[in-house]
């Protein structure tokens, strides 16, 4: 398994304010994925001139900000099993989020640390 991306992901009830803050810090919106899990949830990927990245998720019903690491991999199943072996649990039970461009899920460690595991679908 190869890690192909590794950046912070912030889920926030005030996502628009965070996006504005990161824009003032020099980040630009690269793309936005909408309708995640058939809900009004969207994720904005941002990048600055130095190549640093951050993702901001909006529309999720969380009372406060939740910060995790987004880890993109080339083999979702292998990474998923590795995290399970280390005590991580899928926050969606057995469900995975499937979109036209990726497979994702939030994996949570026994201490509460979150990794959003993701594999991009390549045509």
Task: Identify the role of each PLM range.
Residues 1-19, 25, 31, 66-69, ...:
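N-terminal beta-strand motif that seeds the catalytic metal site of vicinal oxygen chelate
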Residues 4-14, 32-34, 44, 59-123:
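Vicinal oxygen chelate
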Residues 36, 61, 75, 97-98:
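Short beta->alpha connector loops
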Residues 29-65, 108-109, 114-121:
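Conserved short beta-strand elements that form part of the metal-binding/catalytic scaffold
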């Amino acid at each position: 398994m190869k890690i192909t991306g590794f950046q912070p992901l912030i889920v926030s009830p005030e996502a628009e304010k965070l996006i504005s803050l990161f824009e003032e810090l020099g980040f630009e919106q690269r793309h936005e994925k909408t309708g995640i899990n058939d809900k009004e949830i969207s994720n904005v990927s941002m990048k600055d001139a130095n190549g640093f990245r951050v993702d901001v998720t909006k529309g999720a019903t969380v009372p406060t900000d939740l910060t995790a690491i987004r880890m993109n991999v080339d083999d979702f199943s292998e990474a998923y099993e590795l995290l399970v072996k280390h005590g991580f649990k899928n926050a969606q039970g057995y469900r995975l989020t499937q979109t036209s461009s990726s497979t994702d899920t939030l994996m949570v460690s026994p201490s509460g640390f979150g990794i959003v595991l993701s594999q991009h679908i390549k045509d």
